[in-house]
Amino acid sequence: MSQISAKAVKELRDKTGVGMMDCKKALDESGGDMQKAVEYLRKKGAALAAKRAEREASEGVVIVKINDAADTGIILELNCETDFVARGDDFTGFADTIAQTALDGSVDSAEKMMGVSLGEAYDGEKVEDAIKTMTGKLGEKIQLKRLAYVRSEGGLVAGYVHPGSKLGSIVELSGGNSAEAVVLAKDIAMQVAAATPIVVDRSSVPAEYIEKEKEIYRQQALAQGKPEKFVDKIITGRLEKYFQEEVLLEQAYIKDSNTKVSDVLHEFTKQYDMPITVNSFIRYQLGA
């Protein structure tokens, strides 16, 4: 067996990011051939990925990317097994590259992203194979849990990631794409992340759901001995409370709890003569 130099081991480590001992073994197994050693490590990563496929990957990061025109964005969740790995440069850099590649290529799902090449930074590997390689490098199960692509025609897209990258959101608004509108959109994205709305406006709440909730409230009120003549008023009050908690436009604004989100949009329209409408939002929380 040929003698493996420390220089060759370092070169392989620089190329793959894998530990020194694993690089030494790969070169030993490959007779000192650098390309074969890289392939050996990739195969080892694939084998480890298969071995770890059933393991739980509940840590990771949420990444949001918005293009320079502020009309297109990507939000994704990439998982690993431990917070230690999730905070490392290798993992976060990998997640960032996937997000940027998805944004550049207008990829709209995690499934489609698996077949997309990550370019020279990852030796041209498709995401599916790069995940296996990264699994071998980091020693943990890696998975692209979900990914969404958002585009606005004539409006804007903005995002927010909470410090720690465990929570993020992306919103799409119509009505304008000024610098002031972008600032507002970012605040709305922060609102979505912090206040966990489930719909934009009350008209988006399914009628059958409202009827179901009304019946639950009715039965609760009657069970508590409330007079029949007051039950309808109680139901109305509880529904209003529900809307204030779950409907984005009716929530208290995170920057001013005395103002509703809808009021903020209305005031913006008056100030800048630019009607702004929130069309949609997506919120990712790690593991949720």
From Swiss-Prot:
Domain of life according to the entry: Bacteria
CDD domains xrefs: UBA_EF-Ts
SUPFAM superfamilies in UniProt: Elongation factor Ts (EF-Ts), dimerisation domain, UBA-like
One GO cellular component term noted in the UniProt record for this chain: cytoplasm
Transmembrane stretches, start-end: none
Residue segments, region Involved in Mg(2+) ion dislocation from EF-Tu: 82-85
Pfam families, sorted: EF_TS
Keyword field: Cytoplasm, Elongation factor, Protein biosynthesis
Subcellular location field: Cytoplasm
An MF annotation (GO) of this entry: translation elongation factor activity
Annotated function: Associates with the EF-Tu.GDP complex and induces the exchange of GDP to GTP. It remains bound to the aminoacyl-tRNA.EF-Tu.GTP complex up to the GTP hydrolysis stage on the ribosome.
Family as reported in the entry's similarity comment: Belongs to the EF-Ts family.
HAMAP family xrefs: EF_Ts
Protein name: Elongation factor Ts
Natural source organism: Chlorobium phaeobacteroides (strain BS1)
